[in-house]
């Protein structure tokens, strides 16, 4: 289901719940602590142009080509922004997976007139999956995949309260443990990786809440989240295995490192929120 469809459904539901809320007193207060949660859809940004980059000389720059003994590009067939379904680009690739996101949260708001400001702490899980595949002329495939194990966020909130509803903007820091994996059809070389990564990033967006009762609110929230994996890149190192010394991965320095070209793991999140207020 597309983000626009989720947004429309959520907005319609919120409007339905908001009708009785708007009939409440204009003096409805939002100040105080709250606990709650959210559930929604996480959709990844378009990464069709992503590729795999290589370091054949060991300088850490990942700016080399993997060439055959005849100086031809061993990865001339190209790349795709997904998981391969065959050994050639023409076989196609599976689209990256969008999935559910669910979180628990706690926060505190302060109200001054119609202005409400505060903070929210949030933690949860995300079922999205992001892959990129490189195709070699052997032909073989090399697929790098990442998923979020869990994420934590600390965000500020600033909003405007009116007749039982709160409209707000939010933004702050985000942290995630990212699970990485590697698959290949190459059974000749050896492959080792540096495992999972822990990435910092940021998140921002906005939303609306309506009070259905004095101590209970329901809302709709959109967030754009970016985790930057650049400081803790997932790297796959290619070794000799049983390959000949003329193997393209081995010609320059006896081995090659590979990683994905885009270290940013970005997504759009839209979800329903609920909170118990004290």
Would you name each region that the model predicts?
Residues 2-7, 16-278:
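Gram-negative outer-membrane beta-barrel domains
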